Amino acid sequence: MDNCKILFIGDPHFKVNNIEIIDEFIHQCLEQLTSDIDICVIGGDILHTHERLHTTALNKAINFIDQVRKICPTYILVGNHDYENNQQFLSKRHWMNALKEWTNTFIIDYTSIIKIKNFTFGMVPYVPPGRFVEALNIIDNEWWKNVNCIFAHQEFYGCKMGAIESTEGDKWDHSFPLVISGHIHSEQRPQKNIFYPGSVIQHAFGESEDNGLLLLIFNDPEIGEYPLMVKKILDIPKMRTINVKISDFSTLVLDPKKNERIKIICKGSVESFKAFKKNKVV
């Protein structure tokens, strides 16, 4: 029986202040899109600024999608940052409507069922917290309980957003199908059947640094059988945090890569900071 290979790309957030990193991301991402990939799923938040579009970032995003769709069928979940605001529910008020005219391109702004080989997948765009099951039931009550996997861009109960743990996100019964979701930028698994691969590009200090593309290999169409997950880390600039004692700052050696951003957090007593200032070490 043929397996099914899906490449998942999480939250690229094309912005005017990360264009150089985006160029490197596109180059390396396309190298991973080999001919044996059945479909590519872009997990939402391709752009960043909601209803305010920046031409350079928009053109980069459109060009990227155009290149991906020429390699394999491409499914794009509409994320909250792709919408005008975070309160939209299965809405067409986003920037990707014109892309629906392209072949091999599927814009997911409404709950969808996708059949590939012997496998069945659900796809849901971002919906406000608490409305995920409602969105699934839009098509037919509880059809989604019999899929191999659901792709989403959703906040689930218990996921971590920096120091905050979600108490408003959707609760997802442990007997429900596996969900692979965008929206949360740090890789995590709040429960067995929910997995956040994290954003393919690090967007803020404190987010996990070893995120990447996620290759999902489905070998068994039997419901409840989880796929093999292979992380493909890209060699693109990171946002690195270095913790150092103030007494050791003068001997700190940095070897930053091109476009890498580094935050240095110095720790010490009030007295040690006063002594540091007197030494005028820069």
From Swiss-Prot:
PANTHER family: COMPONENT OF ATP-DEPENDENT DSDNA EXONUCLEASE, NUCLEASE SBCCD SUBUNIT D. Its EC number is 3.1.-.-. A divalent metal cation 1 binds at D45, H203. It comes from Invertebrate iridescent virus 6. It holds the Pfam family Metallophos. Belongs to the metallophosphoesterase superfamily. IIV-6 244L family. InterPro entries: Calcineurin-like_PHP_ApaH, DNA_Repair-Maintenance_Comp, Metallo-depent_PP-like. The lineage of its organism: Viruses, Varidnaviria, Bamfordvirae, Nucleocytoviricota, Megaviricetes. GO terms for molecular function: hydrolase activity; metal ion binding. This is Putative phosphoesterase 244L. The keyword Metal-binding applies. It is an enzyme of class 3 (hydrolase). It comes from the Viruses. Keywords: Hydrolase, Metal-binding. The keyword Hydrolase applies. A divalent metal cation 2 binds at D45, N80.
